[in-house]
Swiss-Prot record:
Subcellular locations according to the entry: Cytoplasm
Principal cellular location given in the protein's record: cytoplasm
Record-listed E.C. numbers: 2.1.1.177
Protein name: Ribosomal RNA large subunit methyltransferase H
PANTHER family per the UniProt record, alphabetical: METHYLTRANSFERASE (PTHR33603), RIBOSOMAL RNA LARGE SUBUNIT METHYLTRANSFERASE H (PTHR33603:SF1)
UniProt cross-references to NCBIfam families, sorted A to Z: PRK00103.1-4, tRNA_RlmH_YbeA
Reactions performed catalytically: pseudouridine(1915) in 23S rRNA + S-adenosyl-L-methionine = N(3)-methylpseudouridine(1915) in 23S rRNA + S-adenosyl-L-homocysteine + H(+)
A Pfam family per the record: SPOUT_MTase
Quaternary assembly: Homodimer.
Entry similarity comment: Belongs to the RNA methyltransferase RlmH family.
Organism classification: Bacteria, Pseudomonadati, Pseudomonadota, Gammaproteobacteria, Oceanospirillales
């Protein structure tokens, strides 16, 4: 199984890249995670937000693979404990399909993407900045793996 995080946003600050890399480098090859950056749609004072979301959606749809399990990080998704995430990851691994985790832009995901998802996952009821979401997601994926592997990181 290969995990890919398709995330709207490019050119993250160095502290984000370092934080994400710190967790992802600890994962074994059979639980590897790839970050795929999607260029954000143009936003500004007179920007058409719907058009920006559609552009981001087009880019994400182009990156999705046919047999991938698609999971959206969405405000209306289910709240998972670390144990639930680990159980889901174990199921994904046993299923054998690759997994794409979708992280939308500041205005959310294109509805066309949401019609393709198999699960919706909410990281928090809080509003989180996108750079922090990447680090939090990387850490939780690492923590889920440690739980499955019996590693002492998760206590």
């Amino acid at each position: 199984m290969k995990l890919r995080v398709l995330a709207v946003g490019t050119r993250m600050p160095d502290w984000v890249t370092r934080g994400v890399d710190e967790y992802l480098k600890r994962l074994p090859r059979d639980f590897s995670v790839e970050i795929v950056e999607i260029a954000p749609g143009k936003r500004g004072k007179n920007a058409d937000v719907a058009r920006a979301i559609q552009g981001e959606g087009n880019a994400m749809l182009a990156k999705l693979r046919d047999q991938e399990r698609v999971i959206a990080l969405a405000v209306d998704g289910q709240h998972w404990s670390t144990e639930r995430l680990a159980a889901n990851a174990d199921h994904w691994r046993q299923d054998g399909r690759d997994v794409a985790l979708l992280v939308g832009g500041p205005d959310g995901l294109d509805p066309r993407l949401l019609s393709r998802v198999e699960q919706r996952w909410s990281l928090s009821a809080l509003t989180l900045p996108h750079p922090l979401v990447r680090i939090l997601l990387a850490e939780q994926l690492y923590r889920a793996w440690t739980l499955l592997a019996g590693h002492p990181y998760h206590r």
